[in-house]
Amino acid sequence: MFYTIILTDTQAIFAYSTQAGATEKFHSEMAYAMNQGISCTCVVMDNFGAVYRSEHYTAPMEVAEEE
C-alpha cells in the first residue's frame, strides 16, 4: 500500500492506494495547488515509511502596488 500526504497552510489530506494511484494523486494535488496559488508539500511513501516522491511548492507572494 502506498500513501499520499498533502499539507497546505489550511488543511492536511491523506489518501492511500497502489503506487500508481498514489503517484497520480500526488500529481493532481500539486497541479491543483499551483493553479490555485496555494503553497503545499506532497509526499508519496510506502507502508515502511520509505519516501518515493516528495515535492514542495511555494506560491509566489503578491506584491501590493505602490501609489
Named regions from a protein language model:
Residues Y3, K25, V44-M45:
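Intrinsically disordered, low-complexity peptide-like regions
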Residues M1-A12, I38-S39:
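Short aromatic-glycine-(Arg/Gly/Cys) micro-motifs in beta-strand/loop hairpins
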Residues A31-E67:
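Short, mixed-charge low-complexity intrinsically disordered segments
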Residues L7-T8, T18, A59-P60, A64:
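Serine/threonine-rich low-complexity intrinsically disordered regions
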Residues Q19-G37:
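A short, compositionally biased N-terminal segment around positions ~18-40 that is enriched
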Residues L7, A12-I13, A50, Y57:
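Compositionally biased, intrinsically disordered low-complexity regions
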